Every structure is written in structure tokens, then in C-alpha cells.
Swiss-Prot record:
It comes from the Viruses. This is Uncharacterized protein ORF75.
Length: 423
């Protein structure tokens, strides 16, 4: 007998009174979602009932309510419950990109419950259209259904089944990336799943904008960082690394790990919310095992112009006055000579046809300027160069810098080129 879960009833009391049955999966009433977990617990939710988490009885207050916040569309017509967005074109789209949002959340919960070492012979089967078996996600161990999530009648126009074999040497690898948010004053934003994680971690979502996104499944942006995470998509660490190479920005922090996704995601998310990202590597190492953390080279080249309040010389030229480790900047050009990336004392006679933008390629090779010319030029601009040089030498976040005088295409000024850390 299947008991109807009322909003006034505690889900834990229901589970104690009606423990999991042993009937075949195909016998489940399609009005229900039924979640079987390896630990033996079960959750039954009436499709027509929105059951808010955090409302158990006094006796069960504080217990984890796995999955109770997930309620599908009562007509199963691929219309998102919260947004009302029509997903009828789902049938022709890529599975992991456009699958119904709550379906993907349920899949994540299933994989997150697979704690401990895998013994091999385990497969996650996503069923869409096999006759006699409800649409859903099934965990099979040596051909026997060990846990499942059923979601209603078969879906037409999709593959009958998708099978994903779990790697017996460490499980599936999840990854997340923390990217520098860059400049700007945009309010914090998060998608629905991330907002739920923030609330259940004890933080307020009042000042966080709702951000609609299908992928990645977890997304948050606020302060200096943007967090992106796609749990359980890669069978090996090598594949996980390769999959995110194109998504990395300078200064990004990459975290890859096997096993449950939510503990690591919650830890990183809380670290971002309290602005303690600088301590992330240490706290991850202290709290989790077998976790790969990589900080992408967080250096970037920046430029700044200072106009020289004098008449520009007739001769079109540029030359570097001084610098710190200028060879580092020169090596970043990728060949050739570029404005701001040249060695001190070297000059270029050139008549650019374009605006002398920082890093623009110059006609070479450069020539060593005559010492008397350099002395005469420096005598005129010394009052401008001296404070700039003092400022640069005192900035410990700079790895390299140059000060270049530019008299090209109507511009007469000083170009400061620096290689600095973002963090």
C-alpha cells in the first residue's frame, strides 16, 4: 500500500510507518516518484504536492530530507514547474544540455549516494522508452537494480536507454572551476540548485539574483569569483582535465575529485561566500582526500598611458626607458617586437598606420639609441618617469614591467606595461 504524503505529515514518520517494499519497479504507480537508495531508505512524493523541506515533526527536526524539495510537473509535459518555461523541444536536444532540470538534480543525488569504493560491475542506466519500465535513472550492480529513481511513463523521441559504466578504480570525477569575476559591480547571481545549496548551508539568498541556466548544473557569481560545476561527467581524471582546458581563464582555480559532489561543492561555495578563497587549497587538503587542485597561472599583462605635456617630436619613434625583468615581457610576444615588450635602451623608428595600441607589432629590428639622445630625452621626461618607476618598484604583485616613451601617430606619452598577479 502506498501512503499519500500530506503537507501536514512528516516524511520521516511516513518512512518509518511504511518501509521500502520489495515489489518490481514496473509496479510503481506513475503518479509517484519513488527513490530507493543503497542504504535502504525510501522517499515517496505525490506528484501533485509541493512538499517544502525543513518541515519535519519535532522528533525528526534536523534530519536530512533527501530529495524532498524536488517536485516534478504534475502532467509530465516538460514544462519547468518554477519558471513555467516550455521544454517541449527537449526531445531533439542533447541529453545533458537540455534534460529537464529536476531530472538532472535527481541524477546528481543518485550518484552522490554512491559513497565508498566501487566494486566494479556497476552501471547507471537512464531509461526513456523501454516498455514496462518507467522513465528514470537506475543503478545496476551486476545486472541487478540496486537503486532507482522513477519519473513516469516513457518519453517518446529519445534513446531507449543510456548506460554509463562506473569506473571501478575511483568512480566518476566531478570538476568545478572558480573564475575571477573581473571588474564590474553586478549583484551576486545563482541558479536554482545553487540557491538551494546556499540556503541549506545557512546563508541568505535575499540579495542574490536568480539566474536561469541549463548547464552547468551549479552556478554562482558574486564578489571576485564565478563558480561553475558539473558533477559526475568524467570517467577518468585525464578526461576531466582535458574537458575543462578550454574553459580556463587566468587566475582560475580548478578542483577535480572522485566521489560525492555535494560535500566538496558546499565547501567551495561557503569559502566563496565568506571571501576566504585564498585559504581554499589548504582547507580542501585538510577536509578531503584524493582531490586535485590546480591554480591556473593568474598573471596578466596590463597597460597604462601617461600623457607627456610637451610638444611631440617630429621623429616617429618609441623606446623603452627602464624596466624590471623586461626579458619576461619580451618572451611573451610570441616572436617579433611589440610596443611595451622591448628591452631598455632599444628604440624603434617607425611610422605606424594604426593607433599605437599596447602590444602592437613594431617594424624591427630595434637599434641601440645613442647615449646622448637618451640623456637629452630623459632630462625632459625625468619628472614624469621618476614617480612612476618608484611606484612600480614598490608594487610587490608585479612580476615584470617596462616604461616606454611613445611618439607615434599623434600620441606622445609614456606607456607602462606590467605583468601582475590577479590574486
Amino acid at each position: 500500500m502506498v501512503n499519500t504524503l500530506k503537507s501536514s505529515q512528516c516524511v520521516h514518520c511516513i518512512l518509518e510507518a511504511y518501509p521500502p517494499g520489495a515489489g518490481p519497479v514496473s509496479a510503481i504507480d506513475e503518479r509517484w516518484i519513488r527513490i530507493f537508495m543503497p542504504g535502504g531508505e525510501t522517499l515517496m512524493i505525490d506528484r501533485r504536492l509541493v512538499y517544502e523541506p525543513g518541515s519535519p515533526c519535532t522528533y525528526h527536526t534536523g534530519l536530512d530530507l533527501v530529495g524532498a524539495h524536488i517536485v516534478p510537473n504534475n502532467s509530465f509535459d516538460f514544462r519547468d514547474v518554477e519558471t513555467g518555461r516550455d521544454l517541449s523541444d527537449f526531445r531533439s536536444c542533447d541529453f545533458m544540455e537540455d534534460v529537464h532540470p529536476w531530472f538532472r538534480v535527481l541524477l546528481e543525488i543518485t550518484t552522490d549516494r554512491l559513497d565508498g569504493p566501487h566494486r566494479g560491475g556497476e552501471t547507471v542506466v537512464i531509461n526513456f522508452g523501454r516498455r514496462g519500465v518507467p522513465c528514470g535513472v537506475y543503478l545496476c550492480s551486476h545486472g541487478v537494480t540496486a537503486s532507482c529513481i522513477t519519473m513516469g511513463p516513457p518519453v517518446q523521441g529519445m534513446p531507449e536507454t543510456i548506460s554509463i559504466t562506473i569506473n571501478p578504480f575511483g568512480g566518476w570525477f566531478s570538476w568545478l572551476v572558480l573564475k575571477p569575476a573581473g571588474t564590474g559591480s553586478r549583484k551576486p547571481f545563482a541558479n536554482d540548485l545553487t540557491r538551494y545549496l546556499i540556503r541549506t548551508s545557512g546563508f541568505s539568498t535575499a540579495g542574490i539574483d536568480r539566474f536561469e541556466t541549463r548547464s552547468p548544473i551549479i552556478l554562482y557569481g558574486g564578489g571576485r569569483w564565478v563558480l561553475e560545476c558539473v558533477p559526475h561527467l568524467h570517467p577518468t581524471l585525464t578526461v576531466a582535465k582535458e574537458s575543462i582546458e578550454c574553459a580556463l581563464d587566468p587566475g582560475s582555480i580548478v578542483v577535480i575529485w572522485p566521489g560525492p559532489a555535494l560535500p566538496v561543492v558546499r565547501h567551495v561555495l561557503e569559502t566563496v561566500l565568506v571571501d576566504r578563497v585564498r585559504d581554499l587549497v589548504g582547507t580542501l587538503a585538510a577536509n578531503f582526500e584524493d582531490i586535485f587542485v590546480h591554480r591556473v597561472d593568474d598573471r596578466r599583462v596590463t597597460h597604462r598611458w601617461v600623457e607627456i605635456p610637451k610638444n611631440a617630436p617630429r621623429k616617429k619613434l618609441s623606446f623603452t626607458v627602464t624596466g624590471h625583468r623586461p626579458e619576461v615581457l619580451a618572451a611573451m610576444c610570441g616572436g617579433g617586437w611589440r610596443l611595451g615588450h622591448t628591452m631598455p635602451g632599444m628604440g624603434f623608428d617607425t611610422d605606424l598606420k594604426v593607433e599605437p595600441a599596447p602590444g602592437v607589432k613594431l617594424d624591427g629590428p630595434p637599434r641601440q639609441l645613442h647615449p646622448e639622445f637618451l640623456r637629452a630625452a630623459m632630462a625632459k621626461i625625468e619628472p614624469l618617469v621618476a614617480p612612476i618607476e618608484s611606484e612600480l618598484r614598490g608594487n610587490t604583485s608585479l612580476h615584470a614591467w617596462t616604461i616606454t616613451v611613445v611618439a607615434l601617430v599623434g600620441r606622445f606619452g609614456i606607456l607602462i606595461t606590467a605583468l601582475e598577479s590577479l590574486s
